[in-house]
């Protein structure tokens, strides 16, 4: 029921769902979000196991993966087999085809067998990645660094060409090979931060597509514009409750940026 609802939601937004795999033997993982007074969240999950952990290598659509412009994945598909192997195989397919690889590692303790295993698995794929978004806390968890600035440097050394460390209401640290800078967030009244990081990264990836050049050849001002657009998307997202319902339209984002 929940999976079909989500599929219909995507279709209503004009998103192609042809490659979604349905597994009648497992239910869709459910996330329950508790919202604090400042809009920050606590998560709990129903996943014993969820259908998302059951994706198999043979179910991958190689034509679709090889033909896309950006292949984005997160770390929660690395928690269990067979999805872990399928995810890594999909990333390798995309990379072999010259597709830009985007990665967003999330640490949700209840979905991992241990913190040590989570860190090991989340780090294992970084070398395959071109652009990466990570929170300040998770950047330190991944690297063991003393600060998120140092963590960004260490992540860049692992392979990514561009790293974005999200800093909540402070904005984001954008880091590339020869430069890093904090791009301040738009000041808004946050009621629910669910989806803020995803919205931010969606804005960044949209900008990268519109610039249409290899990330390593982008000028710093172009990288900065990517972050500003991402911050604008996130700034609107946190003003509404919910995940998908709070994601703004492109028109709303540009209007917000002009104010």
Please give the residue ranges for each predicted region:
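Conserved beta-alpha-beta core of the PfkB/ribokinase-like small-molecule kinase fold
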Residues: 76-154, 160-161, 170-171
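Conserved phosphate-binding/catalytic region of the ribokinase-like
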Residues: 92, 144, 148-259
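Acidic, amphipathic alpha-helical patches
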Residues: 61, 122, 190
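Short, hinge-like loop/turn segments at secondary-structure boundaries
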Residues: 9-13, 36-39, 118-122, 149-152, ...
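Conserved N-terminal subdomain of the carbohydrate kinase-like
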Residues: 1-75, 254-259
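Short glycine/serine/threonine/alanine-rich loop segments
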Residues: 15, 99, 243
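Glycine-rich phosphate/pyrophosphate-binding beta-alpha loops
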Residues: 29, 75-79, 234, 240-243
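Short gly/ser/thr-rich secondary-structure transition/capping motifs
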Residues: 49-58, 111-117, 145, 215
């Amino acid at each position: 029921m929940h999976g079909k609802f989500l599929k219909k939601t995507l279709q209503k937004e004009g998103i192609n769902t042809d490659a979604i795999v349905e597994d009648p033997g497992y239910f869709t993982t459910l996330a329950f979000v508790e919202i604090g007074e400042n809009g920050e969240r606590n998560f709990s999950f129903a996943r014993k196991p969820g259908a998302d952990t059951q994706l198999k290598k043979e179910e991958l659509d190689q034509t679709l993966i090889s033909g896309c412009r950006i292949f984005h994945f997160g770390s929660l598909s690395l928690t269990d087999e067979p999805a872990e192997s399928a995810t890594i195989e999909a990333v390798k397919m995309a990379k072999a085809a010259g597709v830009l690889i985007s990665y967003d590692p999330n640490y949700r303790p209840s979905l991992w067998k241990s913190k040590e295993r989570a860190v090991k698995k989340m780090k294992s794929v970084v070398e395959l990645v071109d652009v990466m978004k990570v929170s300040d806390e998770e950047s330190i968890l991944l690297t063991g660094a003393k600060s998120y600035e140092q963590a960004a440097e260490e992540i860049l050394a692992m392979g990514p060409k561009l790293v974005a460390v999200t800093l909540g209401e402070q904005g984001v640290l954008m880091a590339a090979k020869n430069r890093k800078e904090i791009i301040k967030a738009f000041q808004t009244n946050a009621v629910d931060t669910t989806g803020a990081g995803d919205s931010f990264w969606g804005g960044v990836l949209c900008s990268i597509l519109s610039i249409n050049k290899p990330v390593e050849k982008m000028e710093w001002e172009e990288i900065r514009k990517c972050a500003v657009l991402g911050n604008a998307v996130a700034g609107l997202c946190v003003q509404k409750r919910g995940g998908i319902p709070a994601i703004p339209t492109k028109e709303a984002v540009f209007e917000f940026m002009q104010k």
